Amino acid sequence: MSFLVAIVGRANVGKSTLFNVLTNSRDALVFDFEGVTRDRQYGQAKYDDLDYLVVDTGGISDKDVGFDEFMAKQSQIAIDEANLVFFVVDGRSGLTTGDEYVASLLRQKDKKVVVVVNKVDGTDEEAAMAEFYSFGFDKVFAISAAHRRNTQKLVDKFLKKPLNEYYQDYTQTQEHKEQQRHGIHFSLIGRPNVGKSTLTNRMLGEDRVVVFDMPGTTIDSVSIPFERHGQKYTIVDTAGVRKRGKVKQTLEKFSVIKTLQAIQDSNVVVAVVDARQGISDQDLSLIHFAIKNGRALVLAVNKWDGMTEEDRIQVKQDLKRKLFFLQDYVDIHFISALHGTNVGHVFESIDTAYACANKKITTADATRLMQLAVEAHSPPMVGKFRIKLKYAHVGGHNPPVIVIHGNQVSRLPNSYKRYLENFFREALDFRGTPIVFEFKQSENPFADRKNKRSKDEGSKSKKVK
């Protein structure tokens, strides 16, 4: 589960600009749910070698009603889940009643809050920050997100320490969780109302989860351990459900954050798609996020029953076009969660994907496969010399990491890297799991000796003179 930074504040203070700076505008996950008037942005960022999630919460106002009230609740969910809150205000326009409203909400939470005074370019920083100390938060810092002024200092000063502390604690906790983990841990992800809860009940064989037609009405992710044919599992239904005891509550708490964290905490991710609605940009965002995080993947296309043959052909063509990047290594099952059609095959693919993601490969086998790949198709020339791959070994599991050492590997083209991935995947029969390749430049064992010899020869020549 990643460290989470929530960017909050009233509208038009520069939250999205700061989001883009922290994430380098890359891999933004934008979700546009039915009944939601504004997109939400979730991004992955990195500080040193540590990953963290950033959420741009949208504007919070005391006048939020209707859909805006829904979005305000989403912002409060983000605050509740956050490890660190960047409360962004406008240093140019000064303190407003809207800022005071957001501050009052944050004071009710036991959260680490940094008041980020934005848009201070051309103004005196100390003067711009002064009035915002009245909120009662100790940490106040001035930046210009648009010009990247002080943004690196912001993360160095306020993010570095809590991020490192979090991952020190998380590593110890994660080791304990792995020891206590009940079998294969898999999550069901997808848009609200695609049938995840029905599929959960079908997999469990009982009505453990109450199903609702209204999208986005969830209290929390539901985690349930169970056993099937001697294999232990833990299933996580990430959204679209409410626990039986909470039926009377009307909280609309669909949390994308919960979904992203469930993906990171799973061995295998089952992406559930509604066959009648087709695959959406949001589905693709979740699938990309799972792959980027190295998660084994299975695709379940639900509500397949009752569709005409013509519609089924159209759905399959649409899937092939939009999921081309999966390179046919992910199993796709056309199911009916309601009637149980093909659900058993989903379990088979979960087992296969988990086994492949954790397959043990020796250094000898990895090197042998690399040599076979090179014999079949040599790396390209770089100038007068050919890129040389020397040996390979396994660098990790879930996902499998193959580390290849050689000369000039930094200049290896992406096309050859894809060739190696396909070669290893076919040779090892990897299904459902991404494969991560790392390329490392081999050290020249004679470099120091050569330099030393050059120095010795230089000394001798001086003595001769």
UniProtKB/Swiss-Prot annotation:
Residues 359-443 form the KH-like domain. GO terms for biological process: ribosome biogenesis. Residues 446-465 are annotated as: Disordered. Pfam families: KH_dom-like (PF14714), MMR_HSR1 (PF01926). GTP 1 binds at residues 9-16, 56-60, 118-121. One of its GO terms (molecular function) is GTP binding. Residues 3-166, 184-358 form the EngA-type G domain. Signal peptide: none annotated. Keywords: GTP-binding, Nucleotide-binding, Repeat, Ribosome biogenesis. GTP 2 binds at residues 190-197, 237-241, 302-305. PANTHER family: GTPASE DER. Belongs to the TRAFAC class TrmE-Era-EngA-EngB-Septin-like GTPase superfamily. EngA (Der) GTPase family. GTPase that plays an essential role in the late steps of ribosome biogenesis. Associates with the 50S ribosomal subunit. This is GTPase Der.
